[in-house]
Amino acid sequence: MSEVPEELKIKQKFPNWYDWLKPITQKDIKHGFASYIALPKQVNSEFFKMPFGDVERDVFSEDWKLPENWKEIILDSFKETLEKNRAFKVFMDICVRCGACADKCHYYIGTGDPKNMPVMRAETVRSVYRYYFTIGGKLFGKWAGARPLDENVIKEWYYYLLQCSLCRRCSLFCPYGIDTAEVVWWARRMLSRVGLNQRFMCISIEASARTGNHLGLYAGGMAGSIEQGLSELKDITGFDLHTYINKPGADVLFVAPSADYFATPHWYAMLGYLLLFNELEERYGLTVTWSTYASEGGNFGTFHSYEAAQLLNSKIYKEAERLGVKFIIGGECGHMWRDKHQFINTMNNPPKHAEWKKFWDDPDLGQISEKLKGINLGEFISGEHGWIHVLEFVAALIKHKKIDIDPSRNDHWRATYHDPCNVARGMGMLEEPRYVLRNVMNNFYDMPEHTIREKTYCCAAGGGMLAEELMELRMRGVMPRMMALRYVVKKYGVNIMLTPCAIDKAQFPIAVDYWKIPVEIGGPMEMVGNALVLTAFGEKPEDRKYDLRGTPIREEE
């Protein structure tokens, strides 16, 4: 792992508008802030092939080995985007550079670099738009905020467009509703047309295209991980539990982020899923299957390009149709929910098989079990037709009193909740996680209001920023969230921060260690698993002695 900086020094800089028109040069590209460029094995493979991906490039080299006609390719891609994407065209034209977004970006707060203001990040692209696609820019040049493309401008694009986690907090405060994340996404696509792809996200995209998940796990590895989870749960609960993998005719397809199969603390959410699904089958006959083909809920294509996103999320609907399931439950993954909430049904056609259509004509769980009658998923889903988030699903079960809960099993935890950007701002799921947590535990405390729900601060590792070479940027960008966390730790004695996002769970353990905040990191489904009483198996509330981490639930008397 890259070393994190010993001390963060933040110097705020506010140049005039003409100064920022000068692009950076190679000497301005710094370690800790620059993303490595993808290697041919990631972008020139049988499963994921990008233009000019057969060349190895070095972000710290003077020569980035751009194709000879790179400028023509970029401008053609720019023109295509303007013609096909109305929002992108509008966002190019309507910004008045008021600066309302400037101090809303965690990267600008943490770095003090003015080109990390959302307005200026977008201006790196907008200035080129003005020069080539507007009359004012063609006539007045820099006096109209326009500049021509050259290699330094392209390097600046790559450097700063990959210092954005696409969290969209800036768009919340923009009086015109400009979505800078969308500007960045389409500009990254333009860069990919000349061979400039970020290495970290392309490793995951290629692996997912090849194996079905970001980790590159094949069927045996995934199945073995789940079997290990069942073995651990027997030690904790005393019951022989089971699960289904690739089961035709199951009621539900469950899709988790692949980090849940191996990483910590993600693993404890995995155990929570398995407990819930066993209780529901034993009690109500509802069957849930995993898939080794569609074994990844996340989609790093949503950080890269439309085409990459479409390629990866196509697998899930294909598998839902092949297995004949009635609906899909998604696990604790952040960007999965922007993808499934806003993109999947326009990128790929939903399943058309009879079981799916019949269920969604009237999505009442009574179709599966008479004992579940009255739980209409249409009242709980906030995402695309056919999908429900696992926390929305648990909220429905709790509201209708279909599972038994003992919140005292979590009394050794004092929790706060981090809203993942793509779950909160991306799909509007704000209250369901809090409803679940307040039911499964007795000690829950929110962070300050201006740092949560739709105003949540980013973990600073999404959008491809989880790359190890960006460690300094990550530790700077996570500062606002860490300050809010430190507040509730001091005020309420919080000892765990919960988040339903795999990238959060990878970033925050490093961040709390760096910022010296003594808390654990986990997911809401871990707390659900702790509190869930396996009534169908004969378990009583007082029977469970250990939580899913193997920690004693109650102090020895």
From Swiss-Prot:
Source organism superkingdom: Archaea
Q: Does the keyword Electron transport apply?
A: yes
User: Which Gene3D superfamilies has this protein been placed in?
Assistant: Alpha-helical ferredoxin
- Residue span(s) of domain 4Fe-4S ferredoxin-type: 86-115, 155-184
Residues binding [4Fe-4S] cluster 2:
105, 164, 167, 170
Record: residues binding [4Fe-4S] cluster 1:
95, 98, 101, 174
Q: How does it sit in the membrane?
A: Peripheral membrane protein
UniProt cross-references to PROSITE patterns, sorted A to Z: 4FE4S_FER_1, 4FE4S_FER_2
Give yes or no: UniProt keyword Transport: yes
Q: Which SUPFAM superfamilies does the protein's record reference?
A: alpha-helical ferredoxin (SSF46548)
Query: What are its GO cellular component terms?
Result: membrane
**Pfam families, alphabetized:** CCG, Fer4_8
Q: Which GO terms describe its molecular function?
A: 4 iron, 4 sulfur cluster binding; metal ion binding; oxidoreductase activity
> Keywords, A to Z?
4Fe-4S, Electron transport, Iron, Iron-sulfur, Membrane, Metal-binding, Oxidoreductase, Repeat, Transport
Record localization: Membrane
* InterPro entries in UniProt: 4Fe4S_Fe-S-bd (IPR017896), 4Fe4S_Fe_S_CS (IPR017900), Cys_rich_dom (IPR004017), Helical_ferredxn (IPR009051)
Question: Which co-factor is required?
Answer: [4Fe-4S] cluster
Cofactor binding summary note: Binds 2 [4Fe-4S] clusters per subunit.
What does this protein's UniProt record list under function? Has menaquinol-oxidizing activity. The HmeC and HmeD subunits may together mediate electron transfer from menaquinol to an unidentified electron acceptor on the cytoplasmic side of the membrane.
Q: What is this protein called?
A: Hdr-like menaquinol oxidoreductase iron-sulfur subunit
User: What is the protein's species of origin?
Assistant: Archaeoglobus profundus (strain DSM 5631 / JCM 9629 / NBRC 100127 / Av18)
Chain's gene name = hmeD
